Swiss-Prot record:
Job description of the protein: Catalyzes the transfer of the enolpyruvyl moiety of phosphoenolpyruvate (PEP) to the 5-hydroxyl of shikimate-3-phosphate (S3P) to produce enolpyruvyl shikimate-3-phosphate and inorganic phosphate.
Xref: InterPro entries: Enolpyruvate_Tfrase_dom (IPR001986), Enolpyruvate_Tfrase_sf (IPR036968), EPSP_synthase (IPR006264), EPSP_synthase_CS (IPR023193), RNA3'P_cycl/enolpyr_Trfase_a/b (IPR013792)
Reactions this protein catalyses: 3-phosphoshikimate + phosphoenolpyruvate = 5-O-(1-carboxyvinyl)-3-phosphoshikimate + phosphate
A Pfam family matched in the record: EPSP_synthase
A Gene Ontology term for the protein's cellular component: cytoplasm
Organism (species): Roseiflexus castenholzii (strain DSM 13941 / HLO8)
Protein name: 3-phosphoshikimate 1-carboxyvinyltransferase
Binding site for phosphoenolpyruvate: K21, G93, R122, Q169, R349, R391
EC identifiers of the protein: 2.5.1.19
GO molecular function: 3-phosphoshikimate 1-carboxyvinyltransferase activity
Keyword set, alphabetical order: Amino-acid biosynthesis, Aromatic amino acid biosynthesis, Cytoplasm, Transferase
């Protein structure tokens, strides 16, 4: 699909966001192993989360969906059914990695998990190695580093693991596996990724504690169960960031995103934009589904360059492509570092972002773990490619709203992975 964009005169609107992708995945996966039924409202109906539903259905879990409301009839901790076919995770790394952890402790189950070409190219040793240390029997291409992954459910034990990278997917895979283990799992090191799994497990009755950078989970005994958790999924801050950047960069804009998840592990993009000088108001703050939420309004702003690094990176890793676009339009230099994780996303997002920004007229230098963006650029229209990466597709769409001339995007359908309504919203806010 090809979309062509030119900058509108104004941007105005109130945007009801799709449900958060991370929470939507976890709401289905965790309720699948609870005992009883749960209702999940504002579920993200993007392709990734639908892959999660299809996989748990293949494991014998009843799931019903009506528009953006999903009912999950949990099978219980040890009642998943062996799938009769390969589990296709599509483009979803979250589905593949969390399901691998969940199935690793399902004694007697044999499962093969795969995905599309992009997912099959992404490294999996980051989950395979620590799961094997807990007793999991796993294999895959490239000595277990690439999907398809083969899982033979086994008897797992507890233990301690020091996380070398801040990855919510790795952390969550280990916590899900530990539910079926014998003994407490202790996680230390880079536990500073998204904490939705920890929050949901605690709400469902699991014995889990978080003390600074140390997480401990003691598995329930065989007579215990996880309680089903009904919730309304808050709006996805990763999706909201595209509108925040559009409003900050456009010379005549005011956009409000409602019901945004304001979990501190997810507000890195807000913090970065504030540091760059964006005019941001947060109102109507409240708690929904165990997560802090609020309404965020961003207006036209004069941005300046900053350094994005260190502990901030895990809190905005998915938003870095569009933040790089903001940096290209800001005054002064922006340095992004400690973000080597970008190289193993749906694309090598360092290479693809640098190439796209350069085509738009920005001056950008790639580094091994990030990029240096000169800033001050008056972006021009260009012909750009999404490479099948949903974050890139939306980043280049925003570039088309703020650059001079016409921008043409190839592969525009990639937005369906996480934001199926993106193009409809974009049309509505243009004036």
């Amino acid at each position: 699909m090809i979309h062509t964009m030119i900058a509108p005169r104004r941007l105005r609107g109130i945007i009801d966001l799709p449900g958060d992708k991370s929470i939507s995945h976890r709401a289905v996966l965790l309720n699948a192993i609870a005992t009883g039924a749960a209702e999940v409202a504002n579920f993200l109906t993007g392709a990734d989360c639908l892959s999660t539903i299809a996989c748990v259905q293949a494991l014998g879990v009843r799931v019903e969906r009506h528009e953006d409301t999903v009912r999950v009839f949990g099978a219980g901790l040890r009642s998943l059914r062996e799938p009769v076919d390969v589990l296709d995770c599509g483009n979803s790394g979250t589905t593949l990695r969390l399901l691998t952890g969940m199935l690793a402790g399902q004694e007697g189950i044999f499962a093969v998990l795969t995905g599309d070409a992009s997912l099959r190219s992404r490294p999996q040793q980051r989950i395979v190695a620590p799961l094997r240390a807990l007793g999991a029997t796993l294999d895959g291409r490239d000595r277990g580093n690439r999907a398809p992954l083969v899982v033979r459910g086994a008897y797992l034990h507890g233990g301690a693991y020091d996380l070398p990278i801040a990855s919510a997917q790795v952390k969550s895979a280990l916590l899900l596996a530990a539910l079926f283990g014998d003994g407490t799992l202790t996680l230390t090191g880079r536990t500073d990724g998204r904490d939705h799994t920890e929050r949901m497990l605690a709400a469902m009755g699991a014995t889990i504690t978080v003390d600074g950078q140390t997480i401990r989970l003691t598995p329930p005994d065989r007579s215990e169960a996880l309680h089903p958790l009904s919730l309304r999924v808050p709006g996805d801050p990763s999706s909201a960031t595209f509108w925040w950047v559009a409003a900050a960069l456009h010379p005549d804009a005011e956009l409000t995103t409602t019901g945004v998840c304001l979990n501190p592990t997810r507000t890195g993009a807000l913090d970065a934009l504030r540091a760059m000088g964006a005019q941001i108001d947060v109102a109507n703050q409240r708690v929904e589904g165990g997560e802090p939420v609020g309404d965020v309004t961003v207006r036209s702003s004069s941005l300046h360059g900053i350094v994005i690094e260190g502990a901030l990176i895990p809190r905005l890793i998915d938003e870095l492509p569009v933040l790089a676009l903001a940096a290209a339009c800001a005054e002064g230099e922006t340095i992004i570092r400690d973000a080597q994780e970008l190289r193993v996303k749906e694309t090598d997002r360092i290479a693809t972002v640098v190439a796209g920004l350069t085509a738009l007229g920005a001056v950008v230098e790639p580094t091994e773990d990030g990029m240096i963006i000169a800033g001050g650029g008056n972006l021009r229209g260009a012909t750009l490619e999404s490479h099948g990466d949903h974050r890139l597709a939306m980043t280049w769409a925003i570039a088309g709203l703020v650059g001079a001339g016409e921008t043409t995007l190839h592969g525009a359908e990639a937005v369906d992975v996480s934001y199926p309504e993106f193009w409809n919203v974009l049309r509505r806010i243009r004036e």
